[in-house]
Regions:
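Gly/Ser-rich "nucleophile elbow"/oxyanion-hole loop immediately N-terminal to the catalytic nucleophile
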Residues: 143-182, 293-294
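Short beta-strand element of the alpha/beta-hydrolase
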Residues: 96-105
Length: 295
């Protein structure tokens, strides 16, 4: 499949796809809305396929990269769904590292998120990417089916699963005991939520274009935050002014960056919404932030 960029699509069409991805409209409604852009022999179905992720593009760090060791792990989650499984990536050299929990989007633990875990491992972190779909069989290998399963999982229990995964990572003998979290889309919201739920047990949180916690809960945040937003992401950005006001009122340490002219999901290098310049800058800032706060 030819790789396309956001600039290859009208912004109205990208906004329509964003509504579909987040469950505000179904596939049929997207296809109906996309018909107006289907010209020159291009069909709405072809447009849909061109916007979907292509995981052949996700492997910045190959699975067999000699710098990284990976395995599957399952964590007990008595307050959640009982257990949560995930993907553990750690440096091949050394014996103890700071930990980073990697939280997926609203489709489950797909190859992009596994690659993010490996990217952290080559930066000398032990990274664990849990699969919030564990209780319904795990990520099914397809994002559309993953989205359907995602809607079936109790959200509070899933959140407790991520808390359990974070505490498990923190307690591992090969972790220094200092952990952070990075999350994308839904996972960005979970990164904010873990900052609230875990208090001083969390040492750093990096939400990428994630939903914000209630203002009343912000006082519970003890970890410093590095917050990334996409300039064209009106849906998520609408909650930022109130969140920032609460962070300031409660003297929470934070840095926030808005990457102008890019879309929600700009870090995900498997879709046309990926923006290489913004993604690389945000990731550089993320690694520097984790080195500062977890080292």
């Amino acid at each position: 499949m030819e790789r396309k960029n956001a600039s290859d699509f009208p912004q109205e069409l990208l906004n329509l796809f964003d509504l579909y991805v987040h469950g505000d409209i179904d596939r049929r409604a997207f296809l109906d809305g996309a018909k107006k852009f289907a010209t020159g022999g291009l069909t709405a179905a072809a447009i849909f396929e061109s916007l979907r992720p292509n995981y052949a593009w996700a492997e910045q760090i190959p699975k067999d990269d000699g710098r990284v060791k990976t395995e599957r792990a399952t964590v007990d989650s008595p307050s959640g769904n009982g257990k949560i499984s995930g993907y553990l990536a750690r440096p091949a050299q050394g014996s103890k590292w700071p930990g980073v929990l990697v939280v997926h989007e609203n489709r489950g633990l797909n190859p992009y998120i596994e690659d993010v875990a490996r990217r952290l491992a080559v930066e000398n972190f032990i990274a664990f990417a849990p699969d919030g779909l564990t209780s319904v069989g795990g990520y099914p290998g397809d994002d559309e089916k993953g989205g359907e399963l995602f809607r079936k999982v109790d959200r509070e229990k899933m959140t407790q699963d991520f808390v359990a995964a974070a505490q498990w990572l923190k307690a591992r003998s090969d972790c220094t005991g200092k952990i952070g979290v990075v999350g994308f889309c839904f996972g960005g919201g979970i990164a904010n939520t873990l900052a609230v739920r875990m208090g001083s047990d969390l040492s750093a949180a990096v939400p990428f274009y994630g939903g914000q916690p209630a203002a009343a809960d912000v006082a519970k945040i003890k970890a410093p935050l590095l917050i990334h937003y996409a300039g064209l992401d009106q849906r998520v950005n609408a909650g930022w002014p109130a969140y920032e006001a609460a962070l300031k009122a409660n003297h929470v340490s934070y840095e926030a960056f808005v990457y102008e002219g890019v879309n929600h999901g700009f870090h995900n290098d498997t879709t046309p919404r990926y923006d290489e310049t913004a993604a690389k800058l945000a990731w550089k800032r993320t690694i520097e932030f984790f080195n500062k706060n977890l080292g």
